[in-house]
């Protein structure tokens, strides 16, 4: 039976006494009674058309009045955390809506983060979502106050899968449903990106053949383990699980390659595929290098969007829950799971990247082109040394059926 998540409302984020001194001098502006429609004032209706926010910001909102300059100045105040346009004073400092929400969420849920670099990451409009540890560190450094975050009704910090079993007609609660769903997607990752290997994080480093094969095995294993631990997927019939992963494993592999900035230099890839040791016609070499170029282009286009971890998790869920797989027992259910993942991504992008209205569309447009990377080419490039002629689809089926870590014949995954 589907469960309906009851909606909840956050308390006001404004800190008492955080507005300027002009607010206390201006008389309060009466607002409409609860439930009454808002009717904007027009000249001749007896009374200024200023809003409470305008009154608090400038005292007197008339052109040339004493509050006009101050109001204009406030409109250009930057967020002290990332430099974006400030929406007002939140938790003691002028910040944008994104940093306000991030700080509130981090404090209320008592979240702890880790930095993948040297704990000195740049925090600005373009990089504020790259490192949550350094973003929270800067929030506290500039003077945002933990004690100013009001405690209100909070969604569960450990949501269960049942909480997300909503029917298509049920409204999605953005805070409890979508953020909780993304948290579960992220928590399902068996390997943090940094654990794919230090060489993987250095795009200019030319990896050896063994390192390439080991990294490829880790990424494939990571995709299967992630799918096995995300919401809803384990509840599907095992035949449906196998069908979905057998169809989408190569797309998940490309997404993982982009997420960990996998070096894709031509020479070691050809060596890993064994093509340097076998005679090949010139046409076949050109064709194979063209496949490598397509792979490189897809990875680079994803990296150019600066996709963060939450977005990658949502994109992988959208790819995984596809109704294109053959032999699905419940196509409509799989389609609904894809829609839920897409809604989660859309709301996340809207809240975390409010100044990039086209970002959600750009992310979705990257998905169809992932299929231009041939799965057979990925097998030849990365897995022929590991498993020989054994199809990857067979290995995926064995991993799902075994229910435990799969032991590769080439090396052990830890």
UniProtKB/Swiss-Prot annotation:
Ranges of biased composition (kind: Pro residues): 27-37
Renumbered residue ranges of the record's region Interaction with ZFPM2: 117-414
GO MF annotation list: nuclear receptor activity; protein homodimerization activity; retinoic acid binding; RNA polymerase II cis-regulatory region sequence-specific DNA binding; zinc ion binding
GO biological process: anterior/posterior pattern specification; blood vessel morphogenesis; cell differentiation; female gonad development; fertilization; forebrain development; interneuron migration; lymphatic endothelial cell fate commitment
Signal sequence extent: none
Highest taxon above the source species: Eukaryota
The entry's keywords: Activator, DNA-binding, Metal-binding, Nucleus, Phosphoprotein, Receptor, Transcription, Transcription regulation, Zinc, Zinc-finger
Cell location: Nucleus
Compositionally biased residues, Low complexity: 38-57
Gene3D superfamilies: Erythroid Transcription Factor GATA-1, subunit A (3.30.50.10), Retinoid X Receptor (1.10.565.10)
Protein name: COUP transcription factor 2
Organism: Bos taurus
């Amino acid at each position: 039976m589907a469960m309906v998540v009851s909606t909840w409302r956050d308390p006001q984020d404004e800190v008492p006494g955080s507005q300027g001194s002009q607010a206390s001098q201006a008389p309060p502006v009466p607002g409409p009674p609860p439930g009454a429609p808002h009717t904007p004032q027009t000249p001749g209706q007896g009374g200024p058309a200023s809003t409470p926010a305008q009154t608090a910001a400038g005292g007197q909102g008339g052109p040339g009045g004493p509050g006009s300059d101050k109001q204009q100045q406030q409109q250009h105040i930057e967020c002290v955390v990332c430099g974006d346009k400030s929406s007002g004073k939140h938790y003691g400092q002028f910040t944008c809506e994104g940093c306000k929400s991030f700080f509130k969420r981090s404090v209320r849920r008592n979240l702890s983060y880790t930095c993948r670099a040297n704990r000195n990451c740049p925090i600005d409009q373009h990089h504020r979502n790259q490192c949550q540890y350094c973003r929270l560190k800067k929030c506290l450094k500039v003077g945002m106050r933990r004690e100013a975050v009001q405690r209100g009704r909070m969604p569960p910090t450990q949501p269960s899968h049942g909480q997300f079993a909503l029917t298509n007609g049920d409204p999605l609660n953005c805070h409890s449903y979508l953020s909780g769903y993304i948290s579960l997607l992220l928590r399902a990752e068996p390997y943090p990106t940094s654990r794919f290997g230090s060489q993987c994080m250095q795009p200019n480093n030319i990896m050896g053949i063994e390192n390439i094969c080991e990294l490829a095995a880790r990424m494939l294993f990571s995709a299967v383990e992630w799918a096995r631990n995300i919401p809803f997927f384990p509840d599907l019939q095992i035949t449906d699980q196998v069908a979905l992963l057998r169809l989408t494993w190569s797309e998940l592999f490309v997404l993982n390659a982009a997420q960990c900035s996998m070096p894709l230099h031509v020479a070691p890839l050809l060596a890993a595929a064994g093509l340097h040791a076998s005679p090949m016609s010139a046409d076949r070499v050109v064709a194979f290098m063209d496949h490598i170029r397509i792979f490189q282009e897809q990875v680079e286009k994803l990296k150019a969007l600066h996709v963060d971890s939450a977005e990658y998790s949502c994109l992988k869920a959208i790819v995984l829950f596809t109704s294109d797989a053959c032999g699905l027992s419940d196509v409509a259910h799989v389609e609904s799971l894809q829609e839920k993942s897409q809604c989660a991504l859309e709301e996340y992008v809207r809240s975390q990247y409010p100044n990039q209205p086209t970002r959600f569309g750009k992310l979705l447009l990257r998905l169809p082109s992932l299929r231009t990377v041939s799965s057979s080419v990925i097998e030849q490039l990365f897995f022929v040394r590991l498993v020989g002629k054994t199809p990857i689809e067979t290995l995926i089926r064995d991993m799902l059926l075994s229910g435990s870590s799969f032991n590769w014949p080439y090396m052990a995954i830890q």
